[in-house]
Amino acid sequence: MKKFIFCFLYLYTLNIFAVSKIAHNKLNSCSITRNIFNNYEPKVFETTNNLLRKTGRLSKFYGEMILIRGKILDQNCVPVTDAKVYLWQAGSGGKYPYEPLKTRVDKRRFTNKSDSSFTGSGIVTTNNKGEYYFISMLPYKSSHYLRTANIRIEHPNLTTLETRLELSDQNMCDNDCGEISPILTETKKNIQSYCFDLVLQGTTLKRY
């Protein structure tokens, strides 16, 4: 009986330390965001983070202006600087307003006959805090399609991530965080933001 109690206490002690070790590791690691691929990316991305218009053009769009923003992190939870972030989405009418990269796609999901200035795509580079943001519009929602945007993040030292962002109430956030253009925040204080912190597989040169 004494031998049994001794073995039980010994194994219980090992289990405590094992759990403690796992908990400690979690403080220095983030869950990697899973890939969700989309076939409707544009053949050519607009080189701006404003999806509402082409650079140098006036904006004329039909829908609700929003911000899509967040941070890019590596698996050690370190902010990733100078990551290329690509975003593409459908407009308020449910169609993508550009020529698709892939040819074997449902052509009914695209249009080039709209008088809207909405481009549906954009690119931005993360700052030294790993932050990014896009000016966009709330996409179409129906019984078949959720309100989503598609995003891809590329960095030379990390695994490329492509996933889908769900623009739902649970992902809404305040406008008082991060580095957003003062002109935008002053003139559009009521604009709704959706925040997404995304984690890429791999590590940068430093660890928090």
From Swiss-Prot:
Any Pfam family the entry gives: Dioxygenase_C
Gene3D superfamilies reported in the protein's UniProt record: Aromatic compound dioxygenase
Gene Ontology terms for molecular function: ferric iron binding; oxidoreductase activity, acting on single donors with incorporation of molecular oxygen, incorporation of two atoms of oxygen
Top-level EC class as recorded in UniProt: oxidoreductase
E.C. number: 1.13.11.-
Keywords: Dioxygenase, Oxidoreductase
The family this protein is said to belong to: Belongs to the intradiol ring-cleavage dioxygenase family.
UniProt-recorded name of the protein: Putative dioxygenase RT0384
